[in-house]
Amino acid sequence: MHVLISQMQELFRVHDGPRIINEKHIEQWSHSYGLNRASLYDAIAELALGFHNGTLDYEFCDAVVNDLVGIHFEEDNSLFWQVFLAFDAGEYGHDGDRGVDPVEKYTRPEITRIVSKLTA
């Protein structure tokens, strides 16, 4: 999936706007990698590994998962949904946490937990 993540990085480098990834990209990647949508989303969710090891930044990862949820996704207990929720938690300050970096307090520990399960 490293090639797919690289393709996404290129999309975000050359395009600007609220939604970079669209339905056409999902269909193209599903066909190219021989994956149904749910499997493709879970494969893309492995970008959590890149965030965890410092090769992908929060803003990129959060933008990717937000774009994907915006296209079409049903809430469930998939790897993708867990990763989405982890990045989503870093988008805003939580009650009683003024001055706390939500990415460090909420996203990073949750991504660490997810990655630990993936690599166990």
Question: Positions of the model-derived regions?
Answer:
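Acidic, Ser/Pro/Thr-rich low-complexity regulatory regions
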Residues: 1-120
